[in-house]
């Protein structure tokens, strides 16, 4: 990537030579160009929120920025890209969305996330650190910035306007208003599940902002909860890509002797899973881990993997994440261990499972979703 401060060699994480998606886009370039052309003072505390693969903080590393991200993969990509660019790792402070934000912010740069709820939570958490002189600039592709996006900046930060579009990217400029009466932060959000989801019917769930379908139970998970495996056969169970943890919590409620691992690459998701598990006062054993899929889980150590794989990476549709999850599951399963997957029928996961495991069984299905089982032989 060419920046006003020189060339940067960037990659997504984990690196895949077959992946043609770049680690930056026109919105990153637009923001960096604006900062240089307008000679925006990058002194004091510079905070970069939602930098997807570390492109912004790598370019701005000489100014010792603070990165705030919800993504473990984005955080690891940032580390790799900083090292590749010869930047001292200590020059960038890496925070997660679960960490306390800085007490004072002099420059706030926001890569607009897909989730409006996550943007709301981030702005509300950072707002007390803003002052009248804080420079606030958001960036995103035109298709990612909506009237609701601008209203959030207006309601939480202050008067807001946008730039002209360049290469289908747009900037957002907000002026902090010290007199603004901001709303209370509604996140995390708690509610009770419907009465038709098996073991978790009527039970509480807790969602932090940014978790998929944060204000309701998504229909794929609802279908999965109705068709989970019978309890008592599995000792080591992994809820892979756990989201708010309802699937693993349902298993643990049915079989308190099972040892559960909840894992997701989202810090918000794992915090939600932990809160959901505690809200249901489960008596079982559970570990909650933010990470890259099943990295760090020993080979042949797991009896059951439960998975509702995502098939979008930001705005791109891709099956790469599901395939990595499936291959990881095969590695960690014991012989005879099972992978249970829910997915949209049109995604054809049964083909991939047969290719990888040599078998795939349809457990349940309707017009939209299927639950599939693959056994490691």
From Swiss-Prot:
One of its GO terms (biological process) is rRNA base methylation. It comes from the Bacteria. It catalyses: guanosine(1835) in 23S rRNA + S-adenosyl-L-methionine = N(2)-methylguanosine(1835) in 23S rRNA + S-adenosyl-L-homocysteine + H(+). The keyword rRNA processing applies. Its EC number is 2.1.1.174. CDD domains: AdoMet_MTases. It is found in: Cytoplasm. GO terms for cellular component: cytoplasm. Specifically methylates the guanine in position 1835 (m2G1835) of 23S rRNA. HAMAP family: 23SrRNA_methyltr_G. This is Ribosomal RNA large subunit methyltransferase G. It comes from Streptomyces coelicolor (strain ATCC BAA-471 / A3(2) / M145).
């Amino acid at each position: 990537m060419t920046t006003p401060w020189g060339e940067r060699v960037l990659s997504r994480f984990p690196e895949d030579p077959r992946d043609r998606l770049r680690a930056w886009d026109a919105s990153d370039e637009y923001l960096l160009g604006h900062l240089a052309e307008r000679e925006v003072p990058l002194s004091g505390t510079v905070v970069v929120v939602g930098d997807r693969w570390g492109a912004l903080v790598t370019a701005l590393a000489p100014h010792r920025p603070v990165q705030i991200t919800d993504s473990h993969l984005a955080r690891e990509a940032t580390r790799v890209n900083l090292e590749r660019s010869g930047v001292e790792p200590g020059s960038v402070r890496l925070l997660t969305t679960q960490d306390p934000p800085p007490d004072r912010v002099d420059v706030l740069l926001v890569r607009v996330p897909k989730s409006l709820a996550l943007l709301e939570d981030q702005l509300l958490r950072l707002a007390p650190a803003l002052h009248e002189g804080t420079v606030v600039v958001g960036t995103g592709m035109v298709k990612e910035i909506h009237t609701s996006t601008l209203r959030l900046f207006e309601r939480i930060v202050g008067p807001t306007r946008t730039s002209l579009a360049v290469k289908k990217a747009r900037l957002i400029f907000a002026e902090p208003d010290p007199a603004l009466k901001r709303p209370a932060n509604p996140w995390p959000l708690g509610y009770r599940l419907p009465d038709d989801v098996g073991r978790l019917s009527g039970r509480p769930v807790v969602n932090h902002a940014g978790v998929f379908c944060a204000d309701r139970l998504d229909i794929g998970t609802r279908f999965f909860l109705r068709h989970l495996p019978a309890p008592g056969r599995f000792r080591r169970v992994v809820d892979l890509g756990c989201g708010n943890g309802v699937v693993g919590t349902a298993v643990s409620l049915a079989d308190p002797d099972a040892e559960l691992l909840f894992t997701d690459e989202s810090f918000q998701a794992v915090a939600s899973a932990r809160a959901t598990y505690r809200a249901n006062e489960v008596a079982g054993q559970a570990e909650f881990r933010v990470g890259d899929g099943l990295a760090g889980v020993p080979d042949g150590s797991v009896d059951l993997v439960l998975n509702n794989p995502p098939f979008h990476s930001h705005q791109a549709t891709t099956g790469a994440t599901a395939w990595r999850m499936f291959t990881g599951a095969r590695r960690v399963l014991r012989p005879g261990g099972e992978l249970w997957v829910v997915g949209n029928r049109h995604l054809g996961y049964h083909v991939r499972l047969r290719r990888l495991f040599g078998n795939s069984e349809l457990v349940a299905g309707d017009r939209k979703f299927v639950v599939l089982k693959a056994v490691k032989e």
